Design a protein with these regions (language model features):
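Active-site pocket-lining/capping segments in soluble small-molecule metabolic enzymes
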Residues: 1-135, 140-172, 197-303
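Conserved catalytic-core segments centered on acid/base and nucleophilic motifs
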Residues: 138, 186-192
């Protein structure tokens, strides 16, 4: 098998374990997903204050395209005031469109990809529209879109200070793939919720970018609950975004006012789960440091 090791060396995925951190020296940050609009963001911030914890990033899944400009501004302002990154999914995707492929048994894996040049153009416009209202962080789930937005930045069509977060729906399952995503310009990458510590260590050794990991994942992503493992996950994967989904929760994509109460209730419980996980971390590894609000490297909104 020596020849396999030589191939891995050329690919650059056999690096030694190393201690790494965020730009502020912290080992981990907390992320609350499915924060679908201003009211849900308010619920997260209230819950974080009540629980006495810091949320560093919120992310959204329905797409920036389903929010009014005023709602984008409200989310940007709330995130800026709280020192929280607001990461919005790029809206257009195959499972929202007219084709049947993404709704078939074999095509579901392609559901968050962007189909055709017209939808890719809409996706780019969705990013530009959100940046005009102050958003500086986006979820992408399509390789072509990631390449296109990076080119748009290089040409001056999009701001240079944007964070590109690879979605869990495009999670890489080996170090070579996560390294390719880093080379394409991803800023952070969501990896599968069920990775073992050994697999997490392999990915960490291959790349320097932050890894995003569901400590608790929603049922469509496996329904994993690992709150007691947070310390091990951080020690192995730092710099790590510890992401708190919610098992046994109603699916809400695409969300809206009709599901706002559910989204707020889910978000509040996610913050509670994060607080529980932090107690486990403090019990087992009290020296692990979390980023403060507004820390360097966050894709904070702008006015």
């Amino acid at each position: 098998m020596r020849w396999v090791g030589e191939v891995f060396d050329v690919l650059g995925v056999t690096g030694q374990d190393h201690e790494a951190s965020f730009p502020d020296g912290a080992a981990f940050r907390l992320e609350i997903p499915s924060v679908e609009g201003p009211r849900v963001l308010e619920a997260v911030l209230r819950a974080a204050e009540a629980e006495g914890i810091t949320v560093n990033r919120v992310s959204q899944g329905s797409g920036a395209m389903l929010l009014r400009a005023s709602e984008l501004r409200d989310m940007a302002q709330a995130g800026l005031d709280a020192g929280v990154e607001v990461c919005l999914f790029v809206g257009p995707r195959e499972r929202f469109a007219t084709g049947a492929h993404a709704r078939s048994a074999d095509g579901r894996a392609h559901g968050d990809q962007v189909r055709g040049l017209r939808q890719l153009a809409y996706a780019l416009e969705d990013v530009l529209r959100a940046t005009e209202e102050g958003i500086r962080s986006f979820l992408v789930a399509d390789l072509g879109l990631l390449r296109a937005v990076r080119l748009a930045q290089a040409r001056g069509a999009l701001p240079t200070d944007l964070v590109w977060k690879v979605s869990a729906s495009m999670s890489p399952t080996n170090p070579v793939t996560v390294k390719i995503l880093e080379e394409l310009g991803a800023g952070t990458v969501n990896i599968p919720a069920d990775v073992t510590l050994d697999e997490l260590a392999e990915m960490r050794a291959a790349v320097s970018l932050p890894l995003d990991l569901y400590v608790e994942s929603p049922d469509p992503l496996g329904g994993i609950v690992r709150v007691q493992e947070l310390a091990d996950l951080v020690r192995t994967g730092a710099p790590l975004y510890a992401k708190f989904g919610l098992r046994n929760a109603q699916a809400i994509y695409p969300s809206g006012h009709h599901l706002e109460a559910v989204a707020c209730a889910n978000a509040t419980e996610k913050v509670h789960r994060a607080a529980v996980a932090l107690e486990w971390l403090e019990r087992l590894s009290p020296g692990l440091v979390q980023s403060k609000p507004g820390a360097a490297g966050l894709g904070l909104p702008v006015r």
